[in-house]
Amino acid sequence: MKHIVQFSGGKDSTCMLLMMLEKGMQIDEIIFCDTGKEFPGMYVHIGKVEQYIGRKITTLKAEKSFDYYFAEHIKTKGKGKMSQGYGWARMWVRWCTRLLKQEPTKKYLKSQGEYTQYIGIAAD
């Protein structure tokens, strides 16, 4: 079984990763989903984490970009009605999370055989 850490670069996934390494837990791969709209500092942080832990973080990307889904994607809305683009993501319309993070992750994990996925989530 493969042990895969889902790394967002945020405080919770960074802390989880470092704690797992400190405890000597098995980690076969570390994955990061790049939305294409990350702050430049996020890439710097990822590079620093890679250097600190001495391991490569695998970057996953969706097949289509944020800009495509935001403005170009054609979606149907019932009987013959169509609209173009999802527009700004909102709390109740989280297309960005689903299309740019969850779906690429699911697709990748499906190709890995048996796995355990680790996700850092704050307890509060």
Please annotate each region the language model reported.
Residues 1-124:
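ATP-dependent adenylation/nucleotidyltransferase module used to activate substrates
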